């Protein structure tokens, strides 16, 4: 069985990708949720290298978590008004999805925002596997 976290750690170490750019198209939805729920705390679950927050336009500064990036690999404690996870779920092995969903829901007190890719990734892991290890149609995720 593939150790995906080890694969992603190696990929992050040797690659400038997974900078967090996939957040940009979603930012207006996230801002709307923050405003609607009057949220003041936010967790970016699977933040990659966290570069997406360099020019943060949101009214909150998020806590960053990504088990494959040494700088952000420590699991956060406590709860957050909102949890966002963009382009992450498809990188998690199918058998671990229920556990990750449960963990995310336990962190969130007001909202969860997920953006999940349903197509193969352009990226290939160091072991040659596609970076999207759980490819399912939208209906499967809902």
Model-derived segments and spans:
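Short glycine-centered segments of the SAM/dcSAM-binding site in methyltransferase folds
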Residues: 110-113
């Amino acid at each position: 069985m593939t150790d995906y976290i080890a694969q992603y750690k190696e990929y992050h170490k040797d690659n400038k990708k997974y900078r967090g750019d996939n957040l940009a198209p979603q930012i207006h939805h996230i801002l709307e949720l923050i405003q609607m729920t009057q949220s003041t705390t936010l967790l970016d679950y699977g933040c990659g290298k966290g570069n997406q927050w360099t020019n943060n336009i949101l009214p909150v500064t998020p806590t960053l978590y990504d088990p494959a990036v040494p700088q952000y690999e420590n699991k956060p404690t406590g709860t957050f008004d909102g949890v966002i996870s963009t382009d992450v779920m498809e990188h998690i092995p199918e058998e671990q999805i229920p556990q990750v969903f449960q963990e995310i829901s336990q962190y969130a007190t007001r909202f969860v925002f997920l953006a999940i890719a349903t197509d193969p990734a352009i990226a290939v892991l160091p072991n040659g596997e596609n970076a999207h290890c759980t490819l399912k149609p939208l209906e499967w995720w809902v």
